[in-house]
């Protein structure tokens, strides 16, 4: 995907393919289905829209860009993010935002629309984490040890 000259890429019927958008820059990627682990890892400025759910480790070590998931995300969402933005309409799993860090003008941002699991923001060294709890019936929309 990084080698293609196409700037706009659309994937239909995605069923767990991993590493989509890894290291990409200046691409517009639209995914229908459920991408696998490490979606947008090491990304450097692309935009990814997922119309479905996403598996674990989306945005792993991401430098820049935006990932929008119009469903739920798995565990370790935004692991070691250094920049960029991740928006998840629904829930995210355990260890969301773990080991996030900001450096100079890079400030990672994760916004979760509903709930997150335990260990949210563990070892965070910068960046912004927001959990809205829009559909949550719990007293607090975050898990334990946050």
Label for each model-derived stretch:
Residues 1-146:
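Long, distal/terminal scaffolding or interaction modules
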């Amino acid at each position: 995907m990084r080698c293609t000259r196409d700037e706009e890429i659309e994937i239909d019927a995605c069923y767990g393919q991993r590493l989509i958008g890894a290291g990409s820059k200046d691409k517009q990627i639209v995914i229908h289905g459920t991408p696998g682990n490490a979606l947008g890892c090491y990304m450097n400025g692309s935009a990814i829209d997922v119309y479905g759910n996403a598996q674990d480790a989306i945005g792993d070590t991401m430098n820049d860009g935006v990932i929008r998931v119009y469903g739920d995300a798995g565990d370790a969402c935004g692991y070691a993010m250094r920049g960029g933005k991740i928006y998840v309409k629904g829930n995210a799993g355990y260890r969301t935002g773990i080991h996030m860090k900001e450096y100079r003008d890079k400030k990672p941002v994760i916004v979760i629309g509903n709930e997150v699991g335990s260990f949210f923001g563990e070892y965070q060294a910068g960046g912004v984490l927001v959990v809205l709890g829009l559909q949550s019936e719990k007293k607090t929309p975050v898990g334990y040890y946050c």
